[in-house]
Each structure stands twice: as structure tokens, then as C-alpha cells.
């Protein structure tokens, strides 16, 4: 627990309770374990609950007001309920901070009154220097000096603790908001996530950007009103000091106020405009990184780089103007008091007043002190406006519709699943099966209200009647887009039920079509928050065929599989998915086409042993499948079309009815209805007709005559279950040490730890950042601007002193004019510094963004396999935002303060040389304290950045797996984990902010000692220095003392923020790169001869391995593929099929051997030339949000006619090119996503086409059409097909069977099938494929 909870008042005052952390960080690099635990009332779970309760209360108050005042509710509340709720949970803590800030500001602004008294003391003493006995008592001067010191010291403590509460409020609200957003996000309805626009990327933006803006506003909120109080008091005191002469200066303040307000508004407008492009750029980067495999395999790196660069250019065009305007605003804020001072003093002199030193220099102090509130007032209001808009955006999450479980769960129900006239709707932005383009009218995407929303379009699933008794296996079949997966989603509670009744007998587990895998260990993915049972766990591994896979992994089940399971094959991910559902031990298991990603043999084992076997015996199972050969083992079969159940019944009943299922079986069945003995004497061709007849006649022999009707509820005969194929687990893998005992389980991370630098930021980092801009031009200009600004700043009070003394005997007008010139040049110098550094910031940030993006786009796949997507996108969002908005300004301010510190020391030392003694001592203390602080602060910032990324990764990953998490009932567990990660990050964040307060209280207290030393010196030298010189020294140190502290703080803060530069530079300079993208001489020659001309491929002695592994995944492989040949690759998961494809695309480089295409070694050419010459249809379809046209042709290179043709050839004619596709293709079925991926490849005209499990998620009827298209359209095109579904490759010219990276068989399908003990024949037997089942070659 943090020592703050038990610290005494002195320790709390000085923040001494954090000393142990600072000592630890000073002596060694800090680690996460060094961080203190948060106090319970600061934990996110507590805060999130408080916020949600306060929000509910405020909304109820608003609702009561609306009901009581129906005529006053036309306009929305000026302050939204969320902001009131945030105020409620921090009210006491926050507003006590406001009171402290007010007292500190009042004390600061009245300090010049003591300065005036000291100057009067010095004047009286100086005037009586000849008669020192009559001079004022030294004690009174010392008393005034001590009084000034005490006021300043008190203001230091008040100010630091006010800021501490402001920063603390920001942290509290940020943690509460992230937790509340996550909790709400995990319960949002599908409608809210699609139509409401609250998808994963939007919610991530809310926690990373909007919650941070509210955090930032907490730090500056009180300045918005205390600054106004300061200004009012200061103006009143100026009128008291200068009488009516102060009015011209005050008029300047009044006149400049609307100008600064207008600039602030313009800054806000520019911020909003730039954020539009920032969001677009971040979204583009996110989509490119998320779909990097497609980008690289299609050689789209350069077009996407150009696209992102153009978005960046538009973003920076607004950002450039914004930075220039901000520089102007700061210059005006600095210049306004100076101009006001000049006008007031000139007026004061013109009306005949004597230039009294006490009046002049105390008034000068008032005007100078005005700079702080004038500078921070627009910043504070800008932060508040930003926060208000952020709160408005966040509140939409709490306004949005939540998932309402209308499903009845009755553990005593006889039936496992019962649907009675049930209708469901997705209510997405665009129906997946409609050809109508989206109507993009204004307001269409507005978030839904939490109240139930009327249905405004046809439901996706209509009037479903289905009864599945407990313990039965029900298969769902139908074409692509028929509603099969939607039915699974409906039963999982993801679709909105609009009619009818749904009853389930217990808990559910879901196997989604696309397996959601966490970036954690294999064990954690399977156990998924349940209690660990070693025996059951091992049994699950065995029946799901995972033990052989664990045998190949060095860490067994403790292997971390990476983000989205990147280290696993598609089959392994799906088996992990099935294992998770099996281990969960739910009453009902919903399986959405989970066999399609498995090879034939493994799929047959999984089906026999798990789905239809003992493993899931007694459970109610709903299996969506395209594998019609498994239907005989199912108790009940349902056929769907256009969201309706068109047929249902037992296998025999459906065959007898001669409906749609019988038609499918007639064409594609893999076995007879009755088990027949094989007759070797018959020629396979002669059996085809007999098979067709037996299918249609089998039903007549059955005694079951019941018919399935879509309007009549039909009950499955629970006793009809055929368990003949449930043979149990055979040939169990010998138990090896693949499953680590819980006490010894240690995972080896596949994901690389986030790059964390230790020690101080290197000189190389600063130089690299500086050299990213044209420094040779900007540096001289900046030095000139600094000299002009600082020279004018120093000379301004000196000239005022000379004017007061009449030093040169000049006319009053000359003194006035020169004094005014110094004021103007100060402003111009500051403006020039701001503009030059803004230009530097833009140039440097743009250059580093471009370099980092280029390195990422050309990084090898291994980089993306071991680096979470969230971490990569974080570099281009949060870290790049730091470069855009913070680093340049921090560097400019640091340089400015260093120059001001030097000028202050020189000026005061000229007046009182002994000042060099205390300032030297205090500067040593400054730098010692800073050195003691900076190592800890730097490490805390780095730890905070790492933990922040970790929290964001979990947030994003969880929302991507929302359907699975909700189906398994694990929402609470993930919410608790999110709390844990927020708290872990806040432990570092809170300590980092507290360390800054520790530094501030010490530096500012030393600044008060500087004031004391100058005051004592001028009191001690009262007979030797004039009142004017006393005034200059005191007024200058009063404002300059804070600059000493700011110099150290800015140096530390700059170093802390430079960690973002370190990370971006790591991406810009040190990411491993692929082989050359272009080899101009070779590539140009190949392009000139239109290579490849024929499509002939040769693999000669090919060896390949992943990473540092010693095992070859391809071992001395030799293969010749003739031009135009159709060759298929099959084999068990992990046999090397997909690896073969990766070597052809060179996403995995060979360790030995060569691959040639048309006689050219592919290693000799650039990657762009190679990959752009091939077409790949990948296993996992990558779909982007946007239009269908954009997904087919993201680079806009083809005519619509070409795109329509591709849609027609892939049976997607029901879709419009202008239809909107939601995030990750959420409004498309998995089959439709695969078909779009296929159509995308068809748009490219290449001589070689690769299909990597491209049709696994497509029903067999559509698959037949696609295969026909591939045969006809790709005639003469070399085609390589990787498939688990054996029947899809029977028409291939040759089949190559791989095992452990070696070709074990190769030949035509017919030749290999004839080998009764061959590997291919075994795969066919596992899939129940017989000769008459396909078009054999």
C-alpha cells in the first residue's frame, strides 16, 4: 500500500512519503514491482461504479426536471449529465484544490505590495545615506524581506497542492471513465456497435484520446476562474497605484481579450478539423497494420504509404496553422502586459506625475504577473472546451442501447433449445444480403437511445420454429448468407429478438466461425477463466488432437500464441476454439462451421470423438456445417434459406422428402444413407447412378414419414441418435511433459516485450530528432529570435530605470519611444521563436512519421507476429501526438527559460554582485534535486507508457472477442481484468505525477529563497543602491524566480516526453526490414518482358525454418509445376502447406535451395516485382470498413465493369459496390467475406494464382460454382491450391501430399486414390470420399 495513506502532515506537505521510490530510482533502474499499490478508494472498480451510479442519479434528476417542466426542454442541458456525475465523484477533493489555488493566486498577485514597501524602505534609506542614524531601522527591512519570503513560500505550498489535486482529479476521472466505458462497451447491443458507430476503434479512441483530454482538463480547470480573479485583483491594484493612468493599459487588456478569445476559438476549430484527419490517418494505419498480410502479399505497401502520407499532409496543414496561431496567441499574452505597461507609464509621465520608483516597479510587477493568468486563461478554457466535447462523445456510449437478454433460461426445460415463432434482426448499417446501397442521409448514424428502438427494416431471421431436445446433435445447412451463422448469433444473444420466444436449458458455449484467440498461453485460452482441472484439461487436449501440436512447441501449453493467435495455423486456432468450448462444460454448445478450417483426417477425428462422440455426449449441440458427409451422424437437420427454416427433420426424412437437402445430398453426398459394404469388383464409374438412386429411394424404406414444416414446430426424436461413429479416443498420445503443473507454469512470450530504454535519454536521440528537420536553416534564425527576445526583456526594466533616473538626459518622448520599442521587440522575438519552432516541430514530426511508416510497411512478417497491433498503432497515435504537440513546444520553452535564467542572473548580479553567492548555492541545489528526480521520473514515465499500451491492448482485444466472451458468460471476469490493468497503469501514472509535485515544491521553495536572498541583499545594501535599482532587482526576481524552477521542470519534462521520440526513432531506424523491395535493373528487365510469361514454377532443394528454430518446416523439397497446371497441396495441420505459399511469396525467406518462376530465381528480384505478379486468396479474409468497391479495389485501379464481373463470378451479385461494410466485415457472413477476398484476387490479372484455404467458409454448392469459375476463368493460369476440404481439389491436375515439410505423395487425384494404403487415400477415407464423389483427374 502507498505510504501516502499513513503519512504525517509534514510528509504530505513536502511529498516526503515518496522519497523511497525516488531513492530506488536514483540507485537502480525501476521495475514494475517497485510501484506502490493504490488506495482502495482510488481503484478503478470503485471509481467506475461510483461514476455509473452518479450518472444514473443525474439522469434521473434530468428526467424529473423534464417531466416537471415540459415547456423548458427544447434545448439540451448546457452541462451534460456525465460532467455533473464526474463532478459528483470528485467534488470534495477537487474543489478543495480550487480553494487552495485561489488562495495561492491571491497571495501571488498581492506580493508586489510588499515589494513596494521594500522599495520605499530602500528609498528612505538611500535618501538618508548621509545621516544613517536617521535612516529606517534595518530590522523593519529584514522583516519585510522575511514577510515577502513567507508569503511566497505559503503560495508555493498552496499552489503545489492545488495542482496535486488537479492532477489527481484527472487521474481519478480517467480511470473511472475507462472502466465505465469498458463495462458499458462489453454490454452494448449489436445495433449500438454498428448503427451507433461504437465499434472497437471508436471505443479505443474514447479511452486513449477523449479520456486523456478530460484528464488534462482536470489539471487546468481551476485556472479558468482563478486567473479571472487574479486579473480583477491586479487591475484594481494597478488603478490604486497609478490612478487613472492605469486605464490605457487596462484598455489594452480589455481590447486584447476578445482577440485572444477569437484566436482560442479558431484554435479549437482547427483542432477539430485536424482531429478529423488524425482519426482518418490512425484508422488507415490501423487497417493497414491489421491487414498487413494482404497489403504485403498484394504488394500494396507503396500505394498505402502514399495514401497515409496524403492524410498526414492534410492533418499537418491544419496543425501548421494551429501551431502558428498558438505562437501568436502566446506572443500576444506575453506582449499584452508589456504594451499595457508602456501605455500606462507613458500616460503616467505625460500627466506630470513624478516617476516614483516604488510606484513604477511595483506596478511593473503587477503588469508582469498578469502574464501568467493571461497565458493560462486561454489554455485552461481550451482544455475545458476540449473536455466538454470529449464528455459529449463519451456520453454517447452511456446513451447507447445495451444488450438485453430476452432469452429464457430454464434449467428444468425438457428441450435444450426451443424457438417459437422467433424473429431476429441485426439492424446493421447495411444488410449483408441486400443489393441496395446505403442511404447516407444526415443523422443516419446517430447513436441509438438506450430505450428500445422500433424496428425499421425487415428482420434477418423470420418466424423460426425449432425444438431440439437435450443431448441431441442438430446440424444447420444452407447456402452463403442463408442465416446459419445468424441463428448461432441469435442463440448467443447477439441479435435483437423482435418476436416470438426462445428458451434454452442452461449455459452456452460458442465456437465462432473465425476463432477468437487471446494473446496468452494455450492453457489460458482453453481454461478461459474456469477452475483448472488437470485431468479434464488433458482429456480435452487429447480429444481435440492438440497434444501432437504441443509436442512441437518448446513451452508446451505455456506457449503464448500471440495476438489473434498469429503463431498458430488456422486449424490449430479452430481446435483451440473447440477445446475451449469443450472445457467450459456448458449445457449447450453452438458450433459455427468449426470443421471447415481442419484437414480431413483431423476434422473426422474431432467430429467423431468430440462433436458426435463421448466428449460432448449429453450436451445439446447446434452445428453449422458445409460438410454434408457428417449429416448422417446428426440427430436432426435444419435447412435455411433467406433467414427462414425451409426444411427440418432427420436424415432419412429429408432424403425421403426429396427437398433442398435431398438435392444437395444427391449432388454432394459423401456416403449412402444406409451403411453398405464396398464392392471392389465394381468399377467406380458404374456406382454413380446406383448412388443417386439409393439416395432418393432410401427414404421410402424408412418407417418415419414425418415432414418438416417451417410453420410447424417439430420435435427431434432424442432416441434416434446414431452413435456408431463415436468411437472415442483411440491411439492416445503418450503422456509427455507437455502440460506444465500449475505451480510450475511459466509462459514464454511470443510477443516481444515493448521496447523500453533505460538510463538518461542519449545525445543521439536528441540529435536524431533535431536532424529530422532542416536545422541548418532554422537554428540560426532561432538564435537571432532568442537574442532579440531576451535582449529586449532584460533591457526593458533597465531602460525604465534609466528613464526614472534621467540617466541620459533625453527628452521624455525619447525615453517613452525606446521603452515602447523594447516592448514591441519582446513580442516580435517571442512570436518569431514560436513560429520557427513550430516549423521545426512540423518538419521533424512529418519526417519521423514517414520514416517510421516506411520501416513498418517493409518489416518482415515476423515483426507483426511478435508485436501486438495495438503497440504499433500506439506509435502512430499517442507517441506521434506527443511529437506533434508537446516535444517542440517543450524544447522551445526550455531554451527560452535557460536564456531567461542567464539574463536574470546577469542583470541582478550587476545590481547586487553578492547575489552570485546565493544563486550559485541554490543553482547547485536545483541541479542536484533535478538529478535525484529525473532518473526516477524518466523510468516511471517509461513504465507508465508500457503499462498504458498493455491496458489498451487488453481493451481492444476484449472488445474484438466480445461475442465469445458474452457467450461464455465471462464478461465480469474481463471487466475485473480491465480494472486490474487500469490500476496497474495508474500506479505508475500517479507516482509519476506525484514525483512532479515533489520536484515542484522543492524548486519553488528554493525560488522563494532566491527572493529572500535578493530582498536581504537590497536591504543590506540600502545605502549603496538607488531605489530604482532596488525596484529592478526586486521586481525582476519576483517574476524570474519561477523561471528557475520552470527551467528544471521543463528539462525533466522534456526528457520524460523524449521517451516517445525514442520509441518512434526505434521504429524509424531499427525495425528489421525485408529483402529489397525494388531492384531496379532486374525489375525493369522483368517488367519489359512481361514476366512471368508462362507461370512455370520450380522448387529445388528448398529448405525453410521459422526464426531461430533448428527444425526445417520445409525439408529439401523438390517440385516442378508446369505452366498452367492446377496443383493442390494437402496434408495434416502443420505439414507445411501454407509455408510453401509463404516461400513462394518470400514472406518467409529460404534457408537453402531456390525457387524459380519461368527460369528466374525469385530471390534475385525485388519483392514488389514478385508479389505484384502473383494473386493470393488467403485463408483469413481481411475486410476493411468502407464500401464494397473499396474492398475489391482499394487503389481505384479498375473500372466498375471489372468489379461487377468479379462479383458475378463469385456469386455475390446480390451485393452492391456502394454498400457499406462495417468494421472487420461485421455485417457479412464468413462465407461472404471469403468470396469478397476471392473476387479481390480475380480483379488482378496474373499468371499465377494461389488459393490458401480460400473456400473453407463457403457452402459446398457455392464451392462447386467457385471451382467451376476457377477452372474456366483460370484456364491456362497456374493455380496452387491449399485445402483441407479434399473434395475441392479432386479436379486438380495433380495433388501433392505433404507431411513434416516433405512431399510424401504426388500425382493425379485418381492415381493417388488408387493407392489403398497411400496418404491421400487415407485423407479421402477420413472425409468419407469415394471415387464417384468427384470429378477425378
UniProtKB/Swiss-Prot annotation:
Residues 438-455 have a biased composition (Basic and acidic residues). GO terms for cellular component: membrane. The keyword Lipid biosynthesis does not apply. GO terms for biological process: transmembrane transport. Residues 1-23 form the signal peptide. It is found in: Membrane. It is a multi-pass membrane protein. Residues 432-460, 699-751 are annotated as: Disordered. Induction: Expression regulated by iron through the urbs1 transcription factor. Residues 95-386, 781-1056 form the ABC transmembrane type-1 domain. The keyword Zinc does not apply. It comes from the Eukaryota. Keywords: ATP-binding, Glycoprotein, Membrane, Nucleotide-binding, Repeat, Signal, Transmembrane, Transmembrane helix, Transport, Virulence. InterPro entries: AAA+_ATPase, ABC1_TM_dom, ABC1_TM_sf, ABC_transporter-like_ATP-bd, ABC_transporter-like_CS, ABC_transporter_C-like, P-loop_NTPase. The chain crosses the membrane at residues 94-114, 138-158, 220-242, 247-269, 331-351, 359-379, 769-789, 817-837, 890-909, 915-933, 999-1019, 1028-1048. Glycans are attached at residues 71, 187, 465, 731, 1057, 1227. Residues 417-667, 1097-1325 form the ABC transporter domain. Residues 700-718 have a biased composition (Low complexity). GO terms for molecular function: ABC-type transporter activity; ATP binding; ATP hydrolysis activity; ATPase-coupled transmembrane transporter activity. Pfam families: ABC_membrane, ABC_tran. Multidrug resistance protein; part of the gene cluster that mediates the biosynthesis of siderophore ferrichrome A which is contributing to organismal virulence. Belongs to the ABC transporter superfamily. ABCC family. Conjugate transporter (TC 3.A.1.208) subfamily. PANTHER family: ATP-BINDING CASSETTE SUB-FAMILY C, MULTIDRUG RESISTANCE-ASSOCIATED PROTEIN LETHAL(2)03659. This is Multidrug resistance protein fer6. It comes from Mycosarcoma maydis (Corn smut fungus). The gene is fer6.
